[in-house]
Amino acid sequence: MPTININKVDLERLSNISLSDKMIEDRFPMMGVEVEEIFEEVDKNGKKQNMVQFSINPDRPDYLSVEGLARGFRGFMGINTGIQEFEVLNSNIKVTVEENKTRPYVAFALVKNVLMDELVLESMINLQEKLHWAIGRDRKKLAIGIHDFDKVKAPFTYKEIRGDEIKFVPLGYEDEEMTPREIIEKHEKGIKYAHLIQDDKFPVIVDLNGEVLSMPPIINGTLTKVTPTSKNLLIDITGTEKEAVEETLNIIVCALAERRGTIVSVDVNGKKYPDLTPKSRMISVESINKKLGLNLNPGEIIQAVKKSGMDALYEDGNLIVKIPAYRNDILHNVDLKEEIAINYGYEKFEGKLPSVATTGSKDSVEKKCSAMSDLMIGLGFYEVMNLTLSNQDTLFEKMNLEVEEKDYIEVLKPASIEHRVLRTSILPLLLETLYINKHHSLPQKIFEIGDCVIIDENDTETDTKCKNIKKIAGAITHPLTNFNEIKSSTGALLREFFEDFEFENYEHPAFIPGRCAKIIKDRKEVGFFGEIHPEVILNFELEHPIVGFEITIE
């Protein structure tokens, strides 16, 4: 889970409450936020500061700043309950978006008269970086730019340019102008995120005079650098997924509004941002009590809803719940039930002993998986853990596989275009992991043990006709890797955990012909290994040879 370090005085100031260490340690965990450490540190002026380190659940990105965390705590403690309304003032600021295939979605907002100081600036920068990881997937899905609005002139243009078309001074360089191509070759951030630029097309945001605000997702310009004296902040979010871009903008502007900032709209190709209109969901009182094992009346439930920063109206056995725009974690009614449980008070729930005595033990398959993990680590591999949800592009298209829709399970209403399909294989996700880590040194040896989900029409035990299959997969990349290296690692694993296996030549679209073998046990195929085809390597935007294997455990 991501962690954030928060100045205790700043937290008290925003929470409108004096906080003892005991209160912090007792109350924050009850609202789902773990307290890792309370400590002292010396700031750059030599003064001691009381700090608190919190662990934040990934589903609460609005808690990744002191502003959002304090807002949630005020509600939890009953200081300010109900939905917090944020007024958005109209403006004539416009942004023209020209065609941009690399990062097609963009949203802007202006927050004026922010009460800025060193603490606020530090909090804002930390929130920006945490959101880059939590939602932006290290800027792959989205990137955030925050600018001193007073340094530029509207209107603005978001467009793609060639690598040598313009020059500007990037953040971190005081007076050295560079072209976009020079930035990705020389600048620290440019080198780190150069893999996000495609086909020598560089997205830029420029103002009326052609001054460069930003080259997303790489770097901002020095011209609009935010300082403790800045007060009017222009925020831009660019990315590959519209919903994530808009939700991230809402989180940031609402955090800055906690610093007395005034939110001002920006017209982006005819659409006004930000849109802070609350969402709504209907949920029955009966279903809430059934899930929580309680017998709460509507008034008690509404009180808990209001403490969570939402509003609710009771109507014919149901609650109509208003959800603020900065809450992107309320996807289903079960999420509302969790919020009600938290704000009713976990300490009020009573545990019940089961009527039948049972003795637990570790599942035999899990024991085997644990032993496999130890062996792979002993062979020099690093273990990774990916989500079971993926997408058709990663699982099939990049692997050169032709698969019909009936052969995999697709999510009806996915929260993200990257998480639309339940994975049927682990190896493609390992290649994606190598892509994410391509800027690290070689060799890289990774493995994963996890569930894949397949359709089984002959399954008579469930109504879904689906079942989980436990698999293990591994991948190695470096300039000299070859078939023998992956055969050696796979063989060591098989000799330890499988008996009476044999290899046969195998033609697999993702592997080089003649350099792939399938693993046979009891006359059934249980896995394969070999050298990844160069076309697949390029599909994942990788550069060095890769070998890999995948074996079905159960």
UniProtKB/Swiss-Prot annotation:
Its EC number is 6.1.1.20. The keyword Nucleotide-binding applies. It is an enzyme of class 6 (ligase). InterPro entries: aa-tRNA-synth_II/BPL/LPL, B3/B4_tRNA-bd, DNA-bd_dom_put_sf, Phe-tRNA-ligase_IIc_bsu, Phe-tRNA-synth_IIc_bsu_arc_euk, Phe-tRNA_synthase-like_B3/B4, Phe_tRNA_ligase_beta2_arc, PheRS_beta_core. It comes from the Archaea. GO terms for biological process: phenylalanyl-tRNA aminoacylation. It holds the Pfam family B5. It catalyses: tRNA(Phe) + L-phenylalanine + ATP = L-phenylalanyl-tRNA(Phe) + AMP + diphosphate + H(+). Keywords: Aminoacyl-tRNA synthetase, ATP-binding, Cytoplasm, Ligase, Magnesium, Metal-binding, Nucleotide-binding, Protein biosynthesis. The keyword Magnesium applies. Its cofactor is Mg(2+). Mg(2+) binds at D329, D335, E338, E339. GO terms for cellular component: phenylalanine-tRNA ligase complex. Belongs to the phenylalanyl-tRNA synthetase beta subunit family. Type 2 subfamily. PANTHER family: PHENYLALANINE--TRNA LIGASE BETA SUBUNIT, PHENYLALANYL-TRNA SYNTHETASE BETA CHAIN AND LEUCINE-RICH REPEAT-CONTAINING PROTEIN 47. Tetramer of two alpha and two beta subunits. This is Phenylalanine--tRNA ligase beta subunit. It comes from Methanococcus maripaludis (strain C6 / ATCC BAA-1332). The gene is pheT.
